Design a protein with these regions (language model features):
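Short, acidic, metal-binding catalytic loop of nucleotide-sugar glycosyltransferases
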Residues: 22-33
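A conserved acidic beta->alpha catalytic loop
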Residues: 23, 40-49, 68, 98
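Acidic donor-binding/catalytic loop of UDP-sugar-dependent glycosyltransferases
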Residues: 46, 97-111, 119
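Glycine-rich, basic loop-to-helix element that forms the pyrophosphate-binding segment
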Residues: 65-85
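Acidic/His-rich active-site region of diverse nucleotide-sugar glycosyltransferases
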Residues: 74, 107-196
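Short beta-strand-to-loop acidic/aromatic patch adjacent to the donor-nucleotide binding site
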Residues: 87-99
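A short, conserved alpha-helix in the catalytic core of glycosyltransferases
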Residues: 179-230
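Non-catalytic, C-terminal membrane-associated alpha-helical segments of glycosyltransferases
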Residues: 244-255, 259-305
Length: 305
C-alpha cells in the first residue's frame, strides 16, 4: 500500500494553516496511508502552541518545530531528511494556504505507477484571484491558478498554464509534457529523493520547485499534471508577491536557475540584462541586490534579513 508523508510548512499563519490541515484530514484515504507533518518554521507568534494544543490527540498529525525560519526549502528539507529514513513510499509537499477536494490525493496516487512527480489542478480560492473583478460569482472557485508549468527558455521565465482562465474543461487531460510542477502541491516518489537529493537550499524560496523538477527530468523521472485532482489556493496567503522579499529572491533565483539550465546564448543575454538593470535607476534596491548576490554567489537567505 502507498504510504504517504505530507509536509505542511507554517510561518506565522496558524489559522490559515489549521484550515488547510483540517481540510487534508477530511480527504478520502482509501487505498493509501497518510501521516501529516506540520512543521512550524520558526514562527514568532503562538503558532507552535496552538498546533500542539489542537492536534495533541490526533495521531495522524505530528507537530514539528525548526526553531528558526529556514525558508520554504530549508523548512521542507528539515523534516524530509528525517522522513526519508522511514518507510514512506511518497512525500506530499503542500502549502499551508490551500483547501483540498476530498478526492485530490486519491486521484494523484492512482497515477503513481506511471509518474514519479505529480501536481493537481489548482484553482484560486474564491475572492483570491489576481483579477477578482473579472469574474462572476458563479465563476469564482473555478478560476485556474495552475494547470501545469511551462518555461520560456529564451528569457528564463516560468508561467502557469491556464492561469486566470475559467475552467471549462480545456485542461482536463493529463499532461506529462510540462516543464515543471508546483511546490504548492507536489507528490514525489521516494525514489526521486534517493536519486537526486533534496530541494536545493541555495534557493531558500522561489524556483526551488522548478529546479527540483529539472533535476528529476535529467535523471529520467516522469512528471505529470493531473486534472481530476483539485485544490484551491488562497493566493499570497503565506507570502506576499510583488514586495521586496519577492523581488529579491525571484531576481536572484531566476539567474541561478538560468545559469544552470538555459542555453549559452541565453546565459550571455542574462549577463547583458544584469548590467542594464544595475544601471537602471527605476529598478528597485532589492532587485539590484538580488542581481549582485547571484554574481557574488550569496545564496540561501543571501542579503535578505
Amino acid at each position: 500500500m502507498t504510504n504517504i508523508a505530507a509536509v505542511v510548512l507554517n510561518w506565522n499563519k496558524p489559522e490559515l494553516t489549521i484550515d488547510s490541515v483540517d481540510s487534508i484530514l477530511k480527504i478520502d484515504q482509501s487505498g493509501f496511508k497518510l501521516k501529516i507533518f506540520l512543521v512550524d518554521n520558526g514562527s514568532s507568534d503562538n503558532s507552535l502552541e496552538l498546533f500542539r494544543q489542537k492536534y495533541k490527540s490526533n495521531s495522524q498529525v505530528e507537530v514539528v518545530a525548526t526553531n528558526s525560519n529556514l525558508g520554504f526549502v530549508g523548512g521542507n528539507n528539515f523534516i524530509l531528511y528525517r522522513l526519508i529514513k522511514d518507510k514512506y513510499s511518497h512525500f506530499l509537499l503542500i502549502n499551508n494556504d490551500v483547501l483540498v477536494d476530498p478526492h485530490f490525493l486519491k486521484n494523484l496516487v492512482k497515477n503513481t505507477p506511471k509518474y514519479q512527480l505529480l501536481s493537481p489542478k489548482i484553482y484560486f480560492a474564491p475572492g483570491y484571484e489576481f483579477h477578482a473583478d473579472r469574474y462572476s460569482k458563479k465563476e469564482k472557485g473555478r478560476v485556474i491558478w495552475f494547470a501545469g508549468g511551462k518555461f520560456d527558455w529564451d528569457n528564463v521565465y516560468g508561467s502557469h498554464i491556464g492561469v486566470d482562465e475559467v475552467d471549462r474543461g480545456q485542461y482536463d487531460q493529463i499532461n506529462d509534457q510540462v516543464d515543471f510542477l508546483t511546490g504548492c502541491c507536489l507528490l514525489i516518489s521516494r525514489r526521486v529523493f534517493e536519486k537526486i537529493g533534496f530541494l536545493d537550499e541555495k534557493f531558500f524560496m522561489y524556483l526551488e520547485d522548478a529546479d527540483f523538477c529539472q533535476r528529476a527530468k535529467l535523471n529520467d523521472f516522469k512528471m505529470a499534471y493531473v486534472p481530476d485532482a483539485k485544490i484551491w489556493h488562497i493566493n499570497s496567503g503565506s507570502s506576499k508577491s510583488g514586495g521586496d522579499l519577492h523581488n529579491y529572491f525571484l531576481t536572484r533565483n531566476r539567474l541561478l536557475f538560468g545559469f544552470r539550465y538555459a542555453s549559452l546564448r541565453t546565459k550571455l543575454a542574462l549577463i547583458k540584462e544584469s548590467v542594464v538593470q544595475l544601471l537602471n535607476p527605476s529598478i528597485s534596491k532589492w532587485q539590484k541586490t538580488g542581481i549582485k548576490d547571484f554574481y557574488f554567489q550569496k545564496f540561501n537567505k543571501g542579503s535578505w534579513q
